[in-house]
Amino acid sequence: MAHNLALGAHGEDLAARYLTEAGMEIIDRNWRSRYGEVDLIAAEGDWLVFVEVKTRRGLGYGTPAEAVTFSKQRRIRLLAVEWLRESSRHWSRVRFDVVAIMIGHGPQPQIEHVRDAF
């Protein structure tokens, strides 16, 4: 379990760096409510982006992006509604992205950013 938490935290750090280098601003990390947790919340222009990060070392459980199930998507949407209620800023555009990371398949992690994933 601790190994999985460390892998997840490492993946979130990689994703945050990747998104920042792509011009996005990370405005919240690991935001929690009664519905669970959003990994990253970012701004890209006038877009507010809720980001689910999935990190894997192998494909034994499928690709990282495949781990974002319908129930996980629904939970992230509920979290987004709560976050928006608490936000002092009005966001007119919201989307949900997935950052899928494979570690250990080459010298560098493989990062796939799926915009508007769900």
Swiss-Prot record:
Domain of life assignment:
Bacteria
PANTHER family of this UniProt entry? UPF0102 PROTEIN YRAN
List the InterPro entries hit by this protein, alphabetically. Answer: Restrct_endonuc-II-like (IPR011335), tRNA_endonuc-like_dom_sf (IPR011856), UPF0102_YraN-like (IPR003509)
Sorted alphabetically, which Pfam families does this protein's record hold?
Answer: UPF0102 (PF02021)
CDD domains from the UniProt entry? PoNe_Nuclease
In its UniProt record, a GO molecular function of this protein is: nucleic acid binding
- Tell me what this protein is called: UPF0102 protein ROP_66030
Gene3D superfamilies assigned to the protein according to its UniProt record, in alphabetical order: 3.40.1350.10
Entry's family note: Belongs to the UPF0102 family.
